[in-house]
Amino acid sequence: MLPQPAQSARHESIAGTHRIYHRNPGSLNAKDGLLGHGQRPLAALERKGIRVIQGAITAIDPQARAAEVEGRRLEADALIVALGADLAPERVPGFQAHAHNLYEAQAIPPAAEALRAFRGGQVMIGVFGVPYKCPPAPYEAALLLRGFFSERRVQADIEVFTPQPMSLPVLGQAGCDVVEGRLADYGITFLSNHQAVAVEAGEVVFTAGRRPYDLLLGVPPHRCPQVVAQSGLTDGGEWVPVNPRTLETKFPGVYAIGDVVAIPMADGKPLPKAGVFAEAEGEVVAERIAAAFAGGESQAAFAGEGSCYLEVGNGEAMLVQGRFLDTPAPQVTLLGPSRAYLEEKRAFETERLQKWFG
């Protein structure tokens, strides 16, 4: 939120109930159970002149460009909604009781403990709903776990399932063949078109059949935060529609960025939910607001360009990069694998944390 215009603008960041920023919990360092490297206290933003307000956001009034934080109403000249996607494991009966949630930071330590205690059998990694953030993460997890079990000489059969027709549809069939080929090379079974509807002790229930497991790691369904849905920003849909170039909502002076938005690509599929897009969108919105507050107009526009790394084991990574908003279709390529891409991946993560938090 930017409560005051022009030169005197003061930046406020509403942190919600979280005090700690977690980077990519779904990318799975669960085998170590170490989250510290990817964590930063949000209070560190105050060193950059950003005021962090701690508390649950209980209401959003987009017509007034206002938000309510635990009873305190905050009004602004510009409002940026960046509340992400909430995890909804409760939508799958039995998930919370039987699966380890790959995307919940607090669930990583118990998942790590379960992995260290595992002595062999069937491991399943499942996507329980789409869309979900960081689409490559389940496949990265499977490949890294293969290396983890091999180092420990643990005999594990690993399966990965998704309700989608291929691993990463945005890559097209050729790119998915490469990813799925890597899984096969590592002895990992890939199951497409598998929509899970429930989890029971020792079995995942699908729309057609069941499959057994001894250890289950899952990506739960995602949903728009309730406070956003109740505000009218979703316009009756599942996510917030925005101008794909300016990130403006239908309410003047109200923007939405990141996983909370729905931006269609030219092929009709939604833009993947990925941090690289949230960052680029945020930069566009910041430029446009700053220009407006100074009495001008910015031509900054979201280009839909981005890349992400997929760690694939053996000290290597692949690179997914593209122009996702191109017409008549997204232009997305898959490069690698190579050790250089893994080095780039680690450097990128470190640099981003340093840039944002110091």
Residue ranges and their predicted role:
Residues 257-304, 310:
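A conserved FAD-binding loop/helix module that cradles the flavin
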